[in-house]
């Protein structure tokens, strides 16, 4: 599924596409070219100076290439836009460069070196789909869509109506890359334009000029950069004033786990006043001592795999940004304990995903990577890892600087104005403009009678903590089998977890500890997995849905839910929080329409 660009570097060090026989940026000065063609001809940074508070200025680009336009725009925005505004940059790229190719290209881009190096730290694996990267403490968002523009635009368009403030039409020249300059693109520009939308492109091709005019744009031909004589720029001609919509009304979140914390931060980034009601932070599974973050990948490229891969891509960048002290990207390994599993793992690694996402390791390679003895080959997620759940939740809530109300919500009642009244168990009442419920398997207990219950199933899980040993202390990666084993933290390892459907009891049992340790020993079949000393345990209840997908979205006017994150809550919470925050504020989500439907509350209706 991965399609990297064929690139060579000429004598000047400029990257050249061998596919399109064209350079990625000017030999004279790529930075100056980008500044002149794309920023200046779109009226930037001048237009930023008059943006209203909390406005998200949104740019769409065709052809991410080396990311030069994004990097320069990011730099200029931080330097010159009002501090209470945000930048959302959406870029489409069919042939992504590898990290190594970017590193080489950036050697010529010294004026933006600080930003190029920061971006490289977050550059994702180049698998298809949208990679959402949150930068500059949430003030800048990059949505990097990998794939064919003509296939991606129809899935992206429904949520992008009148949302784009400026278009950067890059990519290679129409004569060399005609597949990109199709009616699909120009129709998308028309649908996403509002009264203030502008565009700029390096080309002056007559076919491009005519297509833009036919789709409602006034087109100007101006002097090109350097040796190029002409280029095109212009703005959308709207018969009526059509303004971009955005909503910043207050939100009250009920819940104290990872989905609540991520949602609070995502909303706070967008200028929304947020308060969180919780009996205590890091409740439920979010309070476990250690947790693994890795995707769910199948031997076929299924919608479920696609969602969890995308969630994983967002999560690893997110935790690096906001919880670096409690995030350990040491890799996650899935040993292949039988031949059938080995064949499936090899197909996943060799045919479906990029090496930066997943690699198949022989038995000696797996043993060396894990740091402990292993008898079988394994699948390795090199960018995955583990975190400290309670510390992560606490850190996110502190970063968000939101109002935290200690208490337990008992009921919700809709008011005549369309807002909500929240009753707490201590008898107090709170008024809320909008409410987001993030209480896991308890969610149906808070839904008003007018809302149909959601098909959420509780799953009880017990994790066991064991004392480290001389053999076990050398474990470097998370090991996942039917359960999991996490590297040492404070002389202890977390072993988990039991899986008991339709149980909500929170009392630990010796039987579950015995099963966790037995399962580890039987799967590993190694001396380090034997005679482990149990030190403590913890029980929590996860929420799951019938189709194993999370559940998000509106259940009533001004009432939203986020639940059913299951056993991969720390993998999916960051992207789900972005989705719900975008839906609440009127911004672009990082998911396709199909993916949004699959996690929507509405899939259970009818």
Swiss-Prot record:
**Residue stretches spanning the membrane:** none
Q: Could you confirm whether the keyword 4Fe-4S appears in this record?
A: no
Q: Which UniProt keywords apply?
A: Cytoplasm, FAD, Flavoprotein, Methyltransferase, Multifunctional enzyme, Oxidoreductase, S-adenosyl-L-methionine, Transferase, tRNA processing
The EC designation for this entry is: 2.1.1.61, 1.5.-.-
- Positions of the UniProt region annotated as FAD-dependent cmnm(5)s(2)U34 oxidoreductase: 254-606
What this protein is reported to do is described as:
Catalyzes the last two steps in the biosynthesis of 5-methylaminomethyl-2-thiouridine (mnm(5)s(2)U) at the wobble position (U34) in tRNA. Catalyzes the FAD-dependent demodification of cmnm(5)s(2)U34 to nm(5)s(2)U34, followed by the transfer of a methyl group from S-adenosyl-L-methionine to nm(5)s(2)U34, to form mnm(5)s(2)U34.
Q: Report the principal subcellular site.
A: cytoplasm
| Gene Ontology biological process terms, A to Z | methylation; tRNA wobble base modification
Co-factor requirement: FAD
Q: Which GO terms describe its cellular component?
A: cytoplasm
The record ties this protein, via Pfam families, to: DAO, Methyltransf_30
GO MF entries: flavin adenine dinucleotide binding; oxidoreductase activity, acting on the CH-NH group of donors; tRNA (5-methylaminomethyl-2-thiouridylate)(34)-methyltransferase activity
What are the start and end residues of every segment in region (tRNA (mnm(5)s(2)U34)-methyltransferase)?
A: 1-237
Q: What is this protein called?
A: tRNA 5-methylaminomethyl-2-thiouridine biosynthesis bifunctional protein MnmC
The Swiss-Prot or TrEMBL record describes its family as follows: In the N-terminal section; belongs to the methyltransferase superfamily. tRNA (mnm(5)s(2)U34)-methyltransferase family.
Among Gene3D superfamilies, the record links this protein to: D-Amino Acid Oxidase, subunit A, domain 2, FAD/NAD(P)-binding domain, Vaccinia Virus protein VP39
